[in-house]
Regions:
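Conserved alpha/beta-domain cores
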Residues: 98-99, 551, 561-907
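S4-like RNA-binding module at protein N-termini
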Residues: 507-540, 545
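Structural motif
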Residues: 249, 442, 459-462, 480, ...
Length: 907
């Protein structure tokens, strides 16, 4: 805990700077930095993230006590620079209070504007500015925001709208008006009175009038918001540790709602949706910042180019656009020129795409925030590659700029062009976040989460989203909002999550109570299907067919760049030629796991497999296996051909035999009829296969050692397919993997069968195919005796699913009964079946690699469990010297990027 808890900034000076984000949060550090490089920023101060942790450890009263002196002095610092006084009716200073963690968490925590107003100060503000409407507009906004954030005024149930919005709608209805800026001073005064009455009625206390009491309430509310439900969920999604805490930034208010020469807006130095190098953003005249991001009013475009593009998307002609929806470039050309110059300066300074908030107060431009902007996966890759081409960053930085998991977004399906041509367009909104989404309509976040859990794909439809909707946005395939622009909460958060989003669709009328949405005359109910095109803003009736994405352009260039630096190769887990082909197009350099058992479940194959299981003698088993042989050979032929010239690691039969027989009465009757035996015979045989703990029973190499004819048949199928391919001019590279070895003698026995069978095939065919025999290290004993096992194994493949299961003693199938509790209580930080346990399982891997290579110097080692596509696990594999990781086809690019990052981070 540092002794200094508060850092001031203003007038070109600052006690902090950009590299202090851990202490000051991203917002506080960047406000300090902007001061230092000459960007106009209202003066203020930042309370450190350490105080947030102190707040939760020691409590509110203790924190207020230790902060009082520094906060009082810092308020005086703002008063001196602004030449006004906090709480003084004759010359009032108003403040904003905002959160700011070290990692950007847009909309997840709380903000209060116009703090310091009461019935006396508002009159002084009106007199000082000569603008009574502005003063009371600021006052009603403050009471509304403070009532929500600090005093907890929320809707009583989810179908109700915000209690303050209900009052606003009532006043507008009485006056026959639609827009906030049409309200008179008398209307605004009525709102303040009614807001205060509602607060007194719902929470039982009067609205606080003392400005310092208001300030402490706001500071504590921001700290408290670090632990609100949506912030916790967002941290979990983004991997942000709880102990980081949030800073609190207090600033002098500058006002975008002082009249027609004032405005507020949000802008990006590049397109956060597609990554294009185009300055873009939105603004509202005579408004405050929260109006833009909350989506309460659909704002106008900052640039002329952006405005014309918006008009084209919305079907607005040029004359109407110019008169009713002009760009800032047209209406405030001098301010626009300053804004454009500063956004360019900030991007050049930070060498990354910037997301900026600004206010224009009576013709003067102020910056309230800059941060590295949230972006889609597509934009992430394009921006990194463009900055590299422009010389702003080097190759290593470009690789490190990309988040491996966000590459997943580039691999999502896209709408099929033929299906789109047939689809019925209902309306068009703003293309807030690209992607293709189809699903059933839901209106509430909790319903979206529940429907998703039940296996439904959903589209969440809202008037506008708020941070409370995060859980629903996470569960939904896409989001549609009636209000809000390209910089609204829905748009920013959707882009950050890689979710398809269409915002500000004017033809959409949502009725929460009836759970209906009317779209240009078509009424749809909860559960009806809807499709969204986040790249064009089009909304379609029903479901629209999709097709797989392709690796092209900047993505392909990034992957090529990764290959330049990576040492760890990436294979795929694939059981069919189709999966193998997909993985190969994504850059896989072989198959790290081909599971033979997955091939047995088709009709004719499962029948032959069951015949083998029912057999009582070796002769009968061999007859059944002869029936299976051509099927297996055909399967291996397809995969080896698809991966021509690349290694294909084929695991011999692994699961216990009971998995191949039916356990229900109906299935057993059908099997008896098919096999021409009695139901009782089937029942007895199934019962005889039953084990108390089948995952530790007769499976893996134990099957092959108990029934060696199974291993012999599979070897014949693998090498028979390889020989056929070699005769046809191909270059098959089979690897035969013996699973679940715990003792070197188990492998010794299996290797002898494989080699003997191979020699017979090669002699009979007159052709030899080079192949390797290896083992899966998935039992702790195998890892600890790896030096012995390496005397027989030509390679190791770590089966981290079972190795994790046996090291922890956790059943992968049953962990759900206690995992949520373990994660909540911090007994476990992560699910060890998703993220490799480096302290335990990882040490077994490290030991096995070291011991194995003492026996066999050039021993090839890889992993093929689910961890092979998880970025932190991939980086661990690089550090312990593995040759490759293997993962599902669609995780291959993610693993390639993570492997390159591991190599770059080591340089």
């Amino acid at each position: 805990m540092t002794e200094k808890r508060v850092y001031t900034f203003g007038n070109g000076k600052a006690e902090g700077k950009a590299d202090m984000r851990n202490l000051l949060g991203g917002k506080g550090a960047n406000l300090a930095e902007m001061n230092l490089i000459g960007v106009p920023v209202p003066p203020g101060f930042t309370i450190t993230t350490d105080v947030c942790n102190e707040y939760f450890e020691k409590g509110k009263e203790t924190v207020i006590k230790v902060l009082t002196s520094e906060v009082t002095n810092s308020v005086k610092h703002i008063e001196d620079l602004m030449n006004s006084k906090f709480g003084d009716p004759s010359n009032p200073l108003l403040l904003s209070v905002r959160s700011g963690a070290r990692a950007s968490m847009p909309g997840m925590m709380d903000t209060i504007l116009n703090l310091g107003l009461n019935d006396e100060v508002v009159e002084g503000l009106a007199k000082k500015t000569g603008n009574e409407r502005f003063a009371y507009d600021s006052y009603r906004r403050f009471v509304q925001m403070y009532g929500d954030v600090v005093l907890g005024m929320k809707p009583e149930n989810k179908e109700d709208i915000d209690p303050f919005e209900a009052i606003i709608q009532n006043v507008k209805a009485k006056r026959g008006i639609k827009l906030d800026n049409e309200m008179s001073v008398a209307d605004l005064k009525e709102l303040v009175t009614e807001f205060k009455k509602a607060i007194k009625s719902q929470i039982g206390n009067d609205f606080p009038t003392d400005p310092m009491q208001q300030l402490w309430g706001a500071i504590c509310a921001v700290f408290t918001s670090w632990m609100n439900e949506r912030a916790i969920l967002y941290r979990k999604m983004e991997g942000i540790p709880q102990e980081w805490g949030t800073a609190v930034t207090v600033q002098a208010m500058v006002f975008g709602n002082m009249g027609e020469t004032s405005a507020t807006g949000v802008c990006f130095s590049r397109d956060a949706g597609n990554g294009e190098n185009v300055f873009n953003g939105e603004y509202l005249v005579n408004a405050q910042g929260e109006d833009v991001v909350a989506g309460i009013r659909t704002p106008q475009q900052i640039t002329l180019e952006g405005s014309r593009k918006w008009a084209s998307q919305q079907g607005v002609d040029e004359e109407i656009r110019r008169t009713k929806f002009p760009s800032m470039e047209e209406t405030m050309p001098e301010i626009y020129a300053q804004l454009n110059s500063i956004q360019d300066k900030l991007e050049q300074h930070y060498h990354d795409m910037q997301d900026m908030e600004f206010t224009v107060q009576d013709g003067k431009l102020w910056f309230l925030q800059t941060r590295n902007g949230k972006r889609t996966g597509t934009a992430m890759v394009k921006i990194a590659m463009d900055l590299l081409k422009e010389g702003q960053i080097d190759e290593k930085t470009a690789i490190l700029r990309c988040e491996p998991n966000k590459l997943d977004e580039l691999l999502h399906p896209v709408f099929d062009k033929e299906a789109l041509a047939q689809a019925r367009v209902l309306t068009r909104g703003l293309p807030a976040s690209p992607g293709a989404a189809s699903g059933q309509i839901v209106f509430f976040a909790d319903d979206a989460a529940k429907w998703h859990e039940d296996g439904h794909k959903v589209i969440m439809v809202r008037i506008e989203t708020s941070p409370e909707d995060l859980a629903g946005m996470t569960a939904a395939e896409g989001i549609l909002t009636a209000r809000g622009g390209m910089t609204s909460h829905a748009a920013v958060v959707a882009r950050g999550m890689g979710k398809c989003c269409v915002s500000g669709a004017g033809g959409v009328v949502v009725n929460y109570k009836k759970r209906t949405v009317e779209i240009d005359g078509t009424i749809l109910h909860e559960g009806d299907y809807l499709s969204l095109n986040g790249s064009t803003g089009e909304v379609y009736f029903g479901e629209v067919a999709t097709k797989a994405a392709k690796v092209t352009g900047d993505f392909a260039q990034l992957m090529t760049l990764c290959d330049k630096y990576t040492k760890l190769r990436v294979r795929t887990n694939a059981d069919t030629p189709h999966d193998a082909e997909v993985a190969r197009t994504f850059g896989a350099v072989g198959i790290g796991l081909c599971r033979t058992e997955h091939m047995f479940f088709e009709d004719l194959k499962i029948k032959a497999m069951r015949e083998m299981i029912l057999s009582d003698t070796v002769e009968d088993r061999e007859k059944a296996l002869e029936k299976l042989l051509p099927y297996q050979k055909q399967d291996f032929y397809g995969i080896l051909k698809c991966m021509d010239g690349m290694p294909v690691n084929i695991r011999l039969l692994d699961p216990p035999l009971h998995e191949f027989v039916p356990h229900d009465e109906e299935g057993q009757e059908a099997m008896a009829k098919e096999m021409g035996v009695s139901v009782q015979f089937i029942r007895n045989r199934v019962n005889s296969l039953s084990e108390h703990n089948p995952m530790l029973g007769l499976r893996g190499c134990r099957l092959g050692n108990t029934f060696p004819e199974i291993t012999a048949m599979q070897t014949r199928a693998i090498l028979g397919a390889a020989v056929q391919l070699k005769k046809e001019g191909f270059n098959p590279m089979p690897e035969i993997m013996v699973p679940l070895v715990g003792i070197v003698h188990e492998l010794d026995n299996q290797e002898a069968i494989i080699r003997k069978t191979a020699n017979k095939i090669f002699k009979a065919e007159g052709v030899e195919v080079p192949f390797k025999v290896g083992t899966m290290i998935e039992i702790p004993r195998a890892a600890l005796t790896a030096d012995l096992i390496a005397s027989k194994a030509e390679y190791f493949s770590f089966g981290t699913n079972d190795l994790t299961q046996m090291t922890f003693g956790y059943s992968r199938d049953d962990i759900a009964s206690f995992l949520p509790s373990y994660l909540e209580k911090k007994i476990l930080d992560v699910d060890p079946f998703q993220v490799l346990d480096q302290e335990g399982v990882g040490q077994l891997i490290k030991t096995a690699v070291e011991k194995g290579r003492k026996t066999r110097k050039n021993l090839k080692c890889g992993i093929c469990g689910e961890h092979g596509g998880e970025p932190t696990s991939v980086k661990f594999c690089h550090r312990v010297g593995l040759n490759y990781v293997s993962c599902s086809p669609f995780r291959v690019p993610i693993a390639r990027l993570a492997a390159a990052q591991a190599a770059v981070e080591e340089m």
